[in-house]
């Protein structure tokens, strides 16, 4: 519809340019009729009608004009970024044209693995929500969430006062979830110090001795084996053992496991980005070995990115008020989630546990879990991907704040996966998807996409299994099977608004399914414990067979 109106508008404009005389002749009678006096006066009604008509035409033209201007501006900025990237490192970087020419001559293209400067390009930019919250209409939605939090607090206080006869300000759920926090602290310090020292020491030792070694391949395999032992043995099994041996509560487990995954990904990126530089230096017989400094590696360990670079765009100053505001919002989101569980989830599952497991109970549970599930989704996104990452970016003067894009406008799941979490997506894209294509040939794009999905799904399921103390692969099934299917079926060719509605509907339903199934399983294991559980008892769903006893 818009396209037809746009074409008709262009046709009218082109006709007016082709026949200026006819157009002028047509305008003259109208002008004369407008200026013709009626009893010595201009027809005011006709003048007002003409003005209203011109205003309506201008309003019709306005969206087309703004859309054209926005399109041209986006093209201009994109071309500017591409030119800037091609001129990086004083013009020494490979251009897109040269890479494409090389690919024609070498189908496997293993020698054309892009050097670090040709991967992700970091530029100074603000987070999207920081820009949107400057608009009054968007900020009102933010205020609505704050008002909802106030109502949750009032509801909890009033109900507790009626039940207990006094104001109850105990946060028992929070204190339980974050229990045994000293264990979390010393475990994190061990993970950090080992990640800071071992990968850097191994890489430095390998890089300095590679060109001098008489057996460079054996030397590389030996150091690579030591690095894998560190990644799998120390960072892999160490934190997991602490979490299980000390029986930490869920939130404390999440902190350790997420930090474990973050350190593994950062160590991999550091080695992956710097090894090609050393190999190229040895091939060119350079006198200097490109080894990053300790300060550069330390900055990367805290920077809100999983892609290593020697330097990043930096802001000139730190806005400490902005940092304090971001951390305050993170703590506000924690309390928000607490009240959601307290007012929406706990009453729901208290009633569910009084009924035997059935299809009716399951369906009601899923649909009743949609609202709290969606609220938790929004709060998790806002607290971590916006507030937490922006707080550390501001403290480190890290310039590139594009931690997410406008995922809420997605009309396809492929676009949603790319824009929901840009930080993790970049790592998966360059080190799972692109490296798979580089190693196995660029003809297996579907297999490379499947590999990236598999890595993400397995890591998510591992985190949930360890943190909840049971294996219940609901997320894996939704992500690996339904997510993969939607990624191919509902692809980027779907642009109509109805697909955005479908995306939101399935996202809401999926979050309801996750919250319902995992909460049911959690309550079932609390109320139907086994005396001597075997390994199969940890992977067999307890909620399917548990009958609650009171």
UniProtKB/Swiss-Prot annotation:
<feature type="transmembrane region" description="Helical; Name=1">
    <location>
        <begin position="139"/>
        <end position="160"/>
    </location>
</feature>
<keyword id="KW-1015">Disulfide bond</keyword>
<feature type="binding site">
    <location>
        <position position="418"/>
    </location>
    <ligand>
        <name>an acyl-CoA</name>
    </ligand>
</feature>
<feature type="transmembrane region" description="Helical; Name=6">
    <location>
        <begin position="370"/>
        <end position="395"/>
    </location>
</feature>
<feature type="binding site">
    <location>
        <position position="415"/>
    </location>
    <ligand>
        <name>an acyl-CoA</name>
    </ligand>
</feature>
<feature type="modified residue" description="Phosphoserine">
    <location>
        <position position="8"/>
    </location>
</feature>
<feature type="topological domain" description="Lumenal">
    <location>
        <begin position="245"/>
        <end position="252"/>
    </location>
</feature>
<dbReference type="GO" id="GO:0000062">
    <property type="term" value="F:fatty-acyl-CoA binding"/>
</dbReference>
<keyword id="KW-0153">Cholesterol metabolism</keyword>
<feature type="topological domain" description="Lumenal">
    <location>
        <begin position="469"/>
        <end position="474"/>
    </location>
</feature>
<feature type="transmembrane region" description="Helical; Name=2">
    <location>
        <begin position="181"/>
        <end position="206"/>
    </location>
</feature>
<feature type="topological domain" description="Lumenal">
    <location>
        <begin position="161"/>
        <end position="180"/>
    </location>
</feature>
<keyword id="KW-0472">Membrane</keyword>
<keyword id="KW-0597">Phosphoprotein</keyword>
<comment type="similarity">
    <text>Belongs to the membrane-bound acyltransferase family. Sterol o-acyltransferase subfamily.</text>
</comment>
<feature type="topological domain" description="Cytoplasmic">
    <location>
        <begin position="491"/>
        <end position="496"/>
    </location>
</feature>
<feature type="transmembrane region" description="Helical; Name=4">
    <location>
        <begin position="253"/>
        <end position="276"/>
    </location>
</feature>
<dbReference type="Pfam" id="PF03062">
    <property type="entry name" value="MBOAT"/>
</dbReference>
<feature type="transmembrane region" description="Helical; Name=3">
    <location>
        <begin position="219"/>
        <end position="244"/>
    </location>
</feature>
<keyword id="KW-0753">Steroid metabolism</keyword>
<comment type="function">
    <text>Catalyzes the formation of fatty acid-cholesterol esters, which are less soluble in membranes than cholesterol. Plays a role in lipoprotein assembly and dietary cholesterol absorption. Preferentially utilizes oleoyl-CoA ((9Z)-octadecenoyl-CoA) as a substrate: shows a higher activity towards an acyl-CoA substrate with a double bond at the delta-9 position (9Z) than towards saturated acyl-CoA or an unsaturated acyl-CoA with a double bond at the delta-7 (7Z) or delta-11 (11Z) positions.</text>
</comment>
<dbReference type="GO" id="GO:0008203">
    <property type="term" value="P:cholesterol metabolic process"/>
</dbReference>
<feature type="region of interest" description="Disordered">
    <location>
        <begin position="1"/>
        <end position="36"/>
    </location>
</feature>
<dbReference type="GO" id="GO:0015485">
    <property type="term" value="F:cholesterol binding"/>
</dbReference>
<keyword id="KW-0256">Endoplasmic reticulum</keyword>
<keyword id="KW-0808">Transferase</keyword>
<feature type="transmembrane region" description="Helical; Name=7">
    <location>
        <begin position="444"/>
        <end position="468"/>
    </location>
</feature>
<keyword id="KW-0812">Transmembrane</keyword>
<keyword id="KW-0012">Acyltransferase</keyword>
<feature type="compositionally biased region" description="Basic and acidic residues">
    <location>
        <begin position="15"/>
        <end position="34"/>
    </location>
</feature>
<dbReference type="GO" id="GO:0005789">
    <property type="term" value="C:endoplasmic reticulum membrane"/>
</dbReference>
<feature type="binding site">
    <location>
        <position position="425"/>
    </location>
    <ligand>
        <name>an acyl-CoA</name>
    </ligand>
</feature>
<keyword id="KW-1207">Sterol metabolism</keyword>
<dbReference type="GO" id="GO:0004772">
    <property type="term" value="F:sterol O-acyltransferase activity"/>
</dbReference>
<feature type="short sequence motif" description="FYXDWWN motif">
    <location>
        <begin position="403"/>
        <end position="409"/>
    </location>
</feature>
<keyword id="KW-0443">Lipid metabolism</keyword>
<feature type="topological domain" description="Lumenal">
    <location>
        <begin position="529"/>
        <end position="550"/>
    </location>
</feature>
<feature type="binding site">
    <location>
        <position position="445"/>
    </location>
    <ligand>
        <name>an acyl-CoA</name>
    </ligand>
</feature>
<protein>
    <recommendedName>
        <fullName>Sterol O-acyltransferase 1</fullName>
        <ecNumber>2.3.1.26</ecNumber>
    </recommendedName>
</protein>
<feature type="topological domain" description="Cytoplasmic">
    <location>
        <begin position="1"/>
        <end position="138"/>
    </location>
</feature>
<keyword id="KW-0007">Acetylation</keyword>
<keyword id="KW-1133">Transmembrane helix</keyword>
């Amino acid at each position: 519809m818009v396209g037809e109106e746009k074409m008709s508008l262009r046709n009218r404009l082109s006709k007016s340019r082709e026949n200026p005389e006819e157009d002028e002749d047509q305008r003259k009678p109208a002008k004369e009729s407008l200026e013709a006096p009626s009893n010595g006066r201009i027809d005011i009604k006709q003048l007002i009608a003409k003005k209203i008509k011109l205003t309506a035409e201008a309003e019709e033209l306005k969206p087309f004009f703004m859309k054209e201007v926005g399109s041209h501006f986006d093209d201009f900025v994109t071309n500017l970024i591409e030119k800037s990237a091609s001129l990086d490192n004083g013009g020494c970087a490979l251009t897109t044209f040269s890479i494409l020419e090389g690919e024609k001559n070498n189908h496997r293209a293993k020698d054309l693995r892009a050097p670090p400067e040709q991967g992700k390009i970091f530029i100074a930019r603000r987070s999207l929500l920081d820009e949107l919250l400057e608009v009054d209409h968007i900020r009102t939605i933010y205020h609505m969430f704050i008002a909802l939090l106030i109502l949750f607090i009032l509801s909890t206080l009033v109900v507790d006062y009626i039940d207990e006869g006094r104001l109850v300000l105990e946060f028992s759920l929070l204190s339980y979830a974050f229990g045994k926090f000293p264990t979390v602290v010393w475990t994190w310090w061990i993970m950090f110090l080992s990640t800071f020292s071992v990968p850097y020491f191994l890489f430095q030792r390998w890089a300095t001795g590679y060109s001098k070694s008489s057996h460079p391949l054996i030397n590389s395999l030996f150091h690579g084996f030591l690095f894998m032992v560190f990644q799998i043995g120390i960072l892999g099994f160490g934190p997991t053992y602490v979490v299980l041996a000390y029986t930490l509560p869920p939130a404390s487990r999440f902190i350790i496991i997420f930090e474990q995954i973050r350190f593994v990904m950062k160590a991999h990126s550091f080695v992956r980005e710097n090894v090609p530089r050393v190999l190229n230096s040895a091939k060119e017989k350079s006198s200097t070995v490109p080894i990053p400094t300790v300060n550069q590696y330390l900055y990367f360990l805290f920077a809100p990115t999983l892609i290593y670079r020697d330097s990043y765009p930096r802001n000139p100053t730190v806005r400490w008020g902005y940092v304090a505001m971001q951390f305050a919002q993170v703590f506000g989101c924690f309390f928000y989630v607490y009240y959601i569980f307290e007012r929406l989830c706990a009453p729901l599952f208290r009633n569910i546990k009084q009924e035997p497991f059935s299809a009716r109970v399951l369906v009601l549970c899923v649909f009743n879990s949609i609202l709290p599930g969606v609220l938790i989704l929004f709060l998790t996104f806002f607290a971590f991907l916006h507030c937490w990452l922006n707080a550390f970016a501001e403290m480190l003067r890290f310039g590139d704040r594009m931690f997410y894009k406008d995922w809420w406008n997605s009309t396809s799941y492929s676009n949603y996966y790319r824009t929901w979490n840009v930080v993790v997506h970049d790592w998966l894209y360059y080190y799972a998807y692109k490296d798979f294509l580089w190693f196995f040939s660029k003809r297996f794009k579907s297999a490379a996409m499947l590999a990236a999905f598999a890595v993400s799904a397995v890591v998510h399921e591992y985190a949930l299994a360890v943190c909840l103390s049971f294996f219940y692969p609901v997320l894996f099934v939704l992500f690996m099977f339904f997510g993969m299917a939607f990624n191919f079926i509902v692809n980027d060719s779907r642009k109509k608004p109805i697909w955005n509605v479908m995306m939101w509907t399935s996202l809401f339903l999926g979050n309801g399914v996750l919250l319902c199934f995992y909460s049911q399983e959690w309550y079932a294991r609390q109320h139907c414990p086994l005396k001597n559980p075997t390994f199969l008892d940890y992977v067999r769903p307890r909620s399917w067979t548990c009958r609650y006893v009171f």
